[in-house]
């Protein structure tokens, strides 16, 4: 099984033609006979590369508008033939061995991503012959090489150059795994696409008429690609790795470029994601500092230095060893303020100035990430693994504007309070429930996270503010869910809160509103909850 296999005949049929001409030219120079189909054969011939059309090889033309091209015993017999076993059968049927298959599949994902794609067009972009050849070659990897990724062309050529025009079993096996991953992803995309259309079955072929398709398909297929093994997971006794989606969202922790620092840990990645997604909520220059997936300081300012100063003063103790995210370029002044003041695990920003990078370089272990700019169009699903199952939901993209707010108390919030309330609400969305956030002048002054009762989260927020000598009087408060009792309002009033934002919807809303009126607190309802677990 470990015997290297020479490459004497290759079949090339690709939708993505990047690099295929150069690859085929090198194979041809090595004396490899090339078989090809349709557009690939035409492209190779136009570039002066000797190639035999599969239809000429099989003696059977492409039929049904190209639906049937390679589905022929001379093709699949040549791929599946077991060397040393099937030669007699091959000779009897005029079948030649095919040693390498180079195939990538019809661009189904690209086709259906077009909102004008009809069901008929989607169907025509389902590859049949391609996956069949890929699976056949992967199955027979003992004798046949399968290449599905253009990124592997150079690797294959290099090994052929260094190994007497042969490929090792190790390489063939590795490429076979890549082939199965490729077809699994492809079939998963098709299953997801059609699985969402179940309610509309038989109605029409127009995608526009399928707007009532289900959001969650009958089976959920998603492929993630391992980008790195991690030293350990949340704890040192847990093994871990980091995987990213096939087409990850831009400006995310999965696509960020690490400019310097130690390798990211499991907790670094999780906390950096929490910080980055929170800072994306703000249009103004903003800074978010996260510890254990909770914001411990958030602020906006005229620039990111002012925002950092505001976020840091919320809770300098918790900020130690935290993650810092910005929604503007990291500049030299802000970088200097950070490295001269605190120990930080990760800094992430859309971009990093050269001067800032030089300053951070003085702390070589500090992980500095550049994520690029975003367009505030985060979509997709959140996943939560449970024993034996998977919970899937939309990402929480719920946002409110001043038009969505209902003032339910006798006193109206002032303009300044209203600005702080809306800021406070954005922060509360990213704090673990039960979440209470105190804000003053567009900066958090106390965060109460993860308490089992809402009133204790309110007390924790007040304690945190007091510990840092921050003045609560005149600040506002956000609660991620309704107050089941008036005690949360009483605690807020005792701390000096003057305005509150919350979803409303409690059976005791009247009691809570009465408590707010008693304390002359202005209160607004959002009608939207932001539980986070």
From Swiss-Prot:
EC numbers, comma separated: 2.1.2.3, 3.5.4.10
Species classification: Bacteria, Pseudomonadati, Pseudomonadota, Gammaproteobacteria, Alteromonadales
GO molecular function, one term: IMP cyclohydrolase activity
SUPFAM superfamilies for the chain: Cytidine deaminase-like (SSF53927), Methylglyoxal synthase-like (SSF52335)
Annotated protein name in UniProt: Bifunctional purine biosynthesis protein PurH
This protein's GO CC annotations: cytosol
Pathway(s) where this gene product acts: Purine metabolism; IMP biosynthesis via de novo pathway; 5-formamido-1-(5-phospho-D-ribosyl)imidazole-4-carboxamide from 5-amino-1-(5-phospho-D-ribosyl)imidazole-4-carboxamide (10-formyl THF route): step 1/1; Purine metabolism; IMP biosynthesis via de novo pathway; IMP from 5-formamido-1-(5-phospho-D-ribosyl)imidazole-4-carboxamide: step 1/1
Top-level taxon of origin: Bacteria
